[in-house]
Structures are given as C-alpha cells and as structure tokens.
Amino acid sequence: MLTLKKSMLLLFFLGMVSFSLADDKREDEAEEGEDKRADEGEEKRAAEKKRFLEGLLNTVTGLLG
C-alpha cells in the first residue's frame, strides 16, 4: 500500500511539473509574435537534435570504448 501511495504521489508531482512547464511555455508564446515564434521553434528543434545526437554519440562511444 505504501509503495502504491509513493508511486501515485510521484506521478502527481511529475504531472504537475509538466503542466506548470507547459503553462509557462504557453504564456511565453502568447507574448511573442507569430513570426518570431516560428524562427525560435526551428532553432530550438535544431539545438535539441544536436544535443540528442551528441548524447547518443557519447553513449555509443562510451559503450564501445
């Protein structure tokens, strides 16, 4: 029973954090212009892809080396 309570509390906490981040992002986007959002979105996606690929490469080389 205690494990179930801990799991439920963890899920609730993570859900609230996710909701809070999404709400903040939505408010920030509402303040910016549509063109600016599109440009920033492309830059963010490119940066995320780069970080992902670097992390993946580091993981693979760590496993091989």
UniProtKB/Swiss-Prot annotation:
Region span, Disordered: 24-45
Pfam families associated with the record: FSAP_sig_propep
Domain of life: Eukaryota
Propeptide: 23-51
Residues carrying Leucine amide: 64
GO cellular component entries: extracellular region
Tissues showing expression: Expressed by the skin glands.
Compartment(s) where it occurs, according to its Swiss-Prot or TrEMBL record: Secreted
Keyword terms, alphabetized: Amidation, Amphibian defense peptide, Cleavage on pair of basic residues, Secreted, Signal
Keyword Secreted attached: yes
Signal peptide per UniProt: 1-22
GO biological process assignments: defense response
Keyword Hydrolase applies: no
Purpose of the protein: Induces contraction of smooth muscle in isolated guinea pig urinary bladder (EC50=4.66 nM). Has no antimicrobial activity against the Gram-positive bacterium S.aureus, the Gram-negative bacterium E.coli and the yeast C.albicans. Elicits histamine release from rat peritoneal mast cells.
Protein family (similarity comment): Belongs to the frog skin active peptide (FSAP) family. Brevinin subfamily.
Name of this protein: Kassorin-M
